[in-house]
Every structure is written in C-alpha cells, then in structure tokens.
UniProtKB/Swiss-Prot annotation:
Listed name of the protein: DNA-directed RNA polymerase subunit omega
Physiological role: Promotes RNA polymerase assembly. Latches the N- and C-terminal regions of the beta' subunit thereby facilitating its interaction with the beta and alpha subunits.
Enzyme class: transferase
NCBIfam families: PRK00392.6-2, rpoZ
Source species of the chain: Sulfurovum sp. (strain NBC37-1)
Superkingdom as given in the UniProt entry: Bacteria
Reactions catalysed: RNA(n) + a ribonucleoside 5'-triphosphate = RNA(n+1) + diphosphate
C-alpha cells in the first residue's frame, strides 16, 4: 500500500486529526524501538519504526484515543 493510502486509512481511525495521528505514531514508534511487540502479521525487519506504527494504526491493530 502506498504511503498516501496508508496515511489516509490511518487518518480515518483518528477522526482526521493529523496532530493526534502524529502523536500516536511517535509514541508507538518509541515503544517499538524500546522492545514492544510488533502487532503486524508479516515481516517488518526492513521497516522503520514509524512505518510500522502507522500500519498498526491503519490496520486497526491499536486504538488511538484522546486522554484527559
């Protein structure tokens, strides 16, 4: 899937809030970098942490919500 399509799909999951998406991708990428389990069902060895996080959100593997 192209990056633009993936981003559009992920944006739907966060009600088109680009700031929320950017924050969620950053936090999830940091967790992955620190050893969190990747939730995708295919090999991600050549992918950047941010790409993995974006795919997890787009595929609905993790839920993003506002806290507070």
């Amino acid at each position: 899937m192209r990056t633009e399509q993936l981003t559009a799909k992920a944006m739907e999951k966060v009600n088109f809030d680009k700031y929320l998406l950017a924050n969620a991708v950053g936090k999830r990428a940091e967790k992955i970098a620190n050893g969190a389990e990747v939730l995708l069902d295919y090999d991600t060895s050549g992918m950047k942490y941010t790409d993995i996080a974006l795919r997890e959100i787009a595929e609905g593997k993790i839920t993003v919500s506002l806290e507070g």
